[in-house]
Amino acid sequence: MDLRLHWLARTLADIPEGDAWLGARERAILSRLRFSKRRSDWRLGRWTAKCALLAFRPDDFPAMPALDILAAEDGGPEAYASCGGAVDVSLSISHSHGRGLCAVAPGKCAVGCDLERIERKSLERSISS
């Protein structure tokens, strides 16, 4: 069994036009998001997570529309195959400034990732302190 943590990054420019790659449950969630930035970030997170899952375990997952990335009870992302229920992986999704990051680990475990832009102003303050 693969016990390594995998990660993959994507950008807004990588997301295909339209929503055909989203599952029915995901499209329902997307339709309830009112603000365009929230919709854009949400789509980026789902695209990045699906690409990560398919890149690291391509034989284990269905095509993108049959793979849903939904919020678990604790609010974290969880993968579901539309024909088989929850997928036995752990996910973490982060997005910032038009870039998305997804960490994937096999099985159920605590996994996390965070993507933030380092601002030059912040570095100058840290150095002068």
Regions found by a protein language model. Name each.
Residues 1-129:
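Core catalytic alpha/beta fold that binds nucleotide/phospho-ligands
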